[in-house]
Swiss-Prot record:
Source organism superkingdom: Eukaryota
Additional note from the record: Completely overlaps KNS1.
Protein name: Putative uncharacterized protein YLL019W-A
Region (Disordered): 1-30
Organism: Saccharomyces cerevisiae (strain ATCC 204508 / S288c) (Baker's yeast)
Taxonomic lineage from the root: Eukaryota, Fungi, Dikarya, Ascomycota, Saccharomycotina
Length: 30
C-alpha cells in the first residue's frame, strides 16, 4: 500500500485502519 505512506489520508483501505487510530497509520501501514 503505497498510498498509506501519506499522512492521515482517508484512503479506501480503511478496512485495516479501523484496527488502529488514523494517526499512526504509517506505523502499521507497512
Amino acid at each position: 500500500m503505497h498510498l498509506s505512506t501519506l499522512p492521515n489520508v482517508p484512503w479506501p483501505n480503511r478496512s485495516f485502519t479501523t484496527k488502529r487510530p488514523p494517526l499512526p497509520n504509517m506505523s502499521f501501514s507497512w
